[in-house]
C-alpha cells in the first residue's frame, strides 16, 4: 500500500507505520487513521490484497519500527539515483559530443543540439541540487534561498565544463601515448572504461568542492558500477592521468595525485584501518602521489602521510604505508619466483581433484 503526499494530515502515514508494533489491522490501520480520507474508502485497497502479500508487507513494516537508521521517512526528498544517472549520461554527451549519441551530429546542427541538451540538464540538475541542499543545507543559507542557490550552483557547474574538457583531453592523450594497443583517440573515448570513470569523477569533483551532498558520490558510484574503477569525487587529480585496464582500482577521498601519473588495474590508494573513524573524518587519510609516478598492478599504498616522490615506480603487489623519496623503485621481494623444467614438474606434481 502506498500513501501519497497530500492524503495525510497531522501525523503522516509514514510516522504511523514506524510506530507499528502489532499485526496487520494495527499497522495498516494506524496508517489509514492518519489519513484525511475515510477508512471506508481506503481500507478496501488493503483488504482486497492477497493475504500472503499483506502478511509479508506487514512483517516488513514492523521491521521499519524495530530497525532504524536505514529508513528515510518524513524527511525531505533525496536526490534521485535514477535521475542523476540520466543526467550523468547527458553530461558525458556534453563533454564528448557525438560519442554518446545514437545518431550522427553534424557541425551545422551542433549548437542547436547542445543548447537543447544544456537546457534539459540545467533544469533537471537544478532540481537534484535543490534536493541536496534541502537534505544538507549549508550554514547561513536560509530555506527561502535554496532554489536560488541551487540554480546558481548548477550554472556554475555547467560553466566549469570547458575546463573539465581541457583536463579530459590530457587524460585521453596520456592513454594514447601510454598504451601501444590504442589505435586512435576515438577508440580510447569509445572503448576505454577509464575515460568514462575519470570524466564522471572530474565533473563530480566540481560538485564535491562546492559542498553539494550526495550527488557527487551517486555519480562516481554509478561510474564505478559501469567501469569497475572506484574514484572518489573528493580526490584531487592532476593532468595527463591514465589508469590502464582500470578494473579494481580504488582512489580514496583525500588522495592528491600529481600530473602525468600512470596506474594499472587493481591499485589501491587507500586509508589505514582504525578503530576511531570519527577522528579521521575531514582529515587527510589517503596518500599523495607526486608527478610522473607509475604504479603497477595490485600495488596498495595507504595513509594520509604517505608520499610517493616524483618520478618513482611502484612495482606490482607492493604494500606501502611509508613515504619513498623521488625517483625510487619499489619492488616486492618477499617471494622468490622459481622456474621448473619438465622433469622437476613431474617430481613435484600432486594429484589434486575436486
Label every model-predicted segment.
Residues 278-280, 284-285:
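Regulatory activation segment
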Amino acid at each position: 500500500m502506498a500513501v501519497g503526499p497530500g492524503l495525510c494530515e497531522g501525523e503522516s502515514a509514514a510516522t504511523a507505520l514506524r510506530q507499528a508494533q502489532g499485526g496487520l489491522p494495527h499497522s495498516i490501520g494506524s496508517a489509514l487513521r492518519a489519513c484525511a480520507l475515510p477508512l471506508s474508502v481506503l481500507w478496501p485497497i488493503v483488504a482486497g490484497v492477497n493475504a500472503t502479500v499483506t502478511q509479508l508487507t506487514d512483517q516488513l513494516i514492523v521491521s521499519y519500527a524495530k530497525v532504524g537508521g536505514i529508513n528515510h521517512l518524513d524527511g525531505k526528498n533525496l536526490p534521485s539515483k535514477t535521475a542523476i544517472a540520466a543526467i550523468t549520461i547527458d553530461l558525458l554527451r556534453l563533454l564528448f559530443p557525438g560519442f554518446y549519441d545514437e545518431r550522427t551530429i553534424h557541425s551545422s546542427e551542433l549548437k542547436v543540439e547542445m543548447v537543447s541538451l544544456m537546457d534539459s540538464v540545467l533544469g533537471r540538475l537544478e532540481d537534484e541540487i535543490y534536493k541536496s541542499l534541502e537534505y544538507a543545507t549549508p550554514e547561513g543559507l536560509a530555506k527561502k534561498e535554496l532554489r536560488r542557490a541551487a540554480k546558481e550552483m548548477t550554472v556554475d557547474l555547467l560553466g566549469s565544463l570547458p575546463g573539465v574538457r581541457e583536463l579530459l583531453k590530457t587524460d585521453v592523450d596520456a592513454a594514447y601515448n601510454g598504451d601501444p594497443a590504442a589505435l586512435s583517440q576515438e577508440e580510447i573515448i569509445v572503448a576505454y572504461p577509464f575515460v568514462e570513470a575519470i570524466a564522471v569523477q572530474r565533473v563530480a569533483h566540481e560538485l564535491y568542492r562546492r559542498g553539494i551532498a550526495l550527488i557527487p558520490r551517486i555519480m562516481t558510484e554509478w561510474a564505478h558500477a559501469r567501469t569497475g574503477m572506484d574514484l572518489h569525487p573528493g580526490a584531487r587529480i592532476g593532468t595527463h592521468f591514465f589508469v590502464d585496464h582500470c578494473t579494481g582500482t580504488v582512489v580514496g577521498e583525500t588522495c592528491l595525485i600529481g600530473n602525468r601519473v600512470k596506474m594499472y588495474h587493481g591499485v589501491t590508494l587507500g586509508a589505514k584501518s582504525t578503530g576511531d573513524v570519527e577522528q579521521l573524518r575531514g582529515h587527510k587519510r589517503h596518500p599523495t602521489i607526486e608527478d610522473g609516478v607509475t604504479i603497477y598492478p595490485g600495488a596498495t599504498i595507504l595513509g594520509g602521510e604517505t608520499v610517493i616522490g616524483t618520478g618513482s615506480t611502484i612495482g606490482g603487489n607492493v604494500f606501502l604505508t611509508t613515504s619513498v623519496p623521488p625517483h625510487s623503485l619499489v619492488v616486492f621481494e618477499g617471494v622468490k619466483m622459481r622456474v621448473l623444467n619438465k622433469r622437476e614438474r613431474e617430481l613435484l606434481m600432486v594429484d589434486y581433484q575436486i
